Amino acid sequence: MKHYRIFSFILLFICAAFGQSCSISSSGREVLDMNTDWAFYRGDVVEGSRTDLDDSGWIPVALPHIMQLEMKHCGGNSIYDGIGWYRRYFKLPAKYKDKRIVVSFEGVMTNCDVYLNGQKVTEHHGGYMGFVADLTDRIDWNGNNVLAVRVSAEPDPLTPPGKPQDKMDFYYYSGIYRDVRMVITDKVYITDPLQEDIVAGGGQFVTYPEVTKDKARAHLATHVRNLTDKDQTLSVFSQLVDSAGHVIAEAE
């Protein structure tokens, strides 16, 4: 049964407990770096997401990347504000077949369409917020997968900043200009707040209803989703960790 649950905990921690150390177990998710081995083409390409497209002449790039960056810019209309394509090949081992697989983009300027193996997965508008492309049921387990991203930096009145460059007093560079990661989890998982798009929710939401000089009380709401076709029995274990990795409070 596909559903979600929100688990709430109150953690009370005392400032004097900061010296306590404790090992932290695995979170049950894998995060893979997707910043390398991209191919880039500045300009539009007809059916640029096709798996059989010849991209041998494209430029090899690593992310973060800007579609055009010259030695200096002086004056409007000197930054590229057109279309660009990015492509990346990858294979996944069969051990991930029963997992949830998403690609997390921290930022693409300005609008983009994301494809896997020639099929559109999602689109995103605006370069200042991250987003997630869910690949779970689209992976080719027998060969190469092609992740393709069509990026548009053309002025769009509906997407900030919403004006052509000669109408603004700052530059906004185009492309996949922030990190990209693949996140692999079980089908029962703590959600991604950007994917869920819930006000003050999704993932883990922390508030501090009581804070004094000597102690503080933290409220944790954990958003868990079940993508299996069965009810699941589970527990959520939360820890509050300081900058040195010491666990100062925990709850289950």
Task: Give the residues covered by each predicted segment.
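Bacterial Sec-dependent N-terminal signal peptides
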Residues: 1-28
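Surface beta-strand/loop "capping" patches
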Residues: 187-227
